[in-house]
Amino acid sequence: MAVPKKKTSKAKRDQRRAHWKRKATIEAQKALSLGKSVLTGRSSFVYPSPEDDEE
């Protein structure tokens, strides 16, 4: 016979949500940092720098 599952506590729910948000914040910071380095021209690992094309 079907038995209802136990309800997840608010503390557990909030803990999981906080962990997910923390991971999302870290990834957003990484993306922002990469975007800044691309715009300032400091990222030779994403796009080859113009000096390499002269050869």
Swiss-Prot record:
PANTHER family: 50S RIBOSOMAL PROTEIN L32, CHLOROPLASTIC (PTHR36083), LARGE RIBOSOMAL SUBUNIT PROTEIN BL32C (PTHR36083:SF1). Keywords: Ribonucleoprotein, Ribosomal protein. Belongs to the bacterial ribosomal protein bL32 family. It comes from the Bacteria. InterPro entries: Ribosomal_bL32, Ribosomal_bL32_plant/cyanobact, Ribosomal_zn-bd. This is Large ribosomal subunit protein bL32. The keyword Lipid biosynthesis does not apply. The lineage of its organism: Bacteria, Bacillati, Cyanobacteriota, Cyanophyceae, Oscillatoriophycideae. The keyword Zinc does not apply. Residues 1-26 are annotated as: Disordered. SUPFAM superfamilies: Zn-binding ribosomal proteins (SSF57829). One of its GO terms (molecular function) is structural constituent of ribosome. GO terms for biological process: translation. One of its GO terms (cellular component) is large ribosomal subunit. Residues 1-23 have a biased composition (Basic residues).
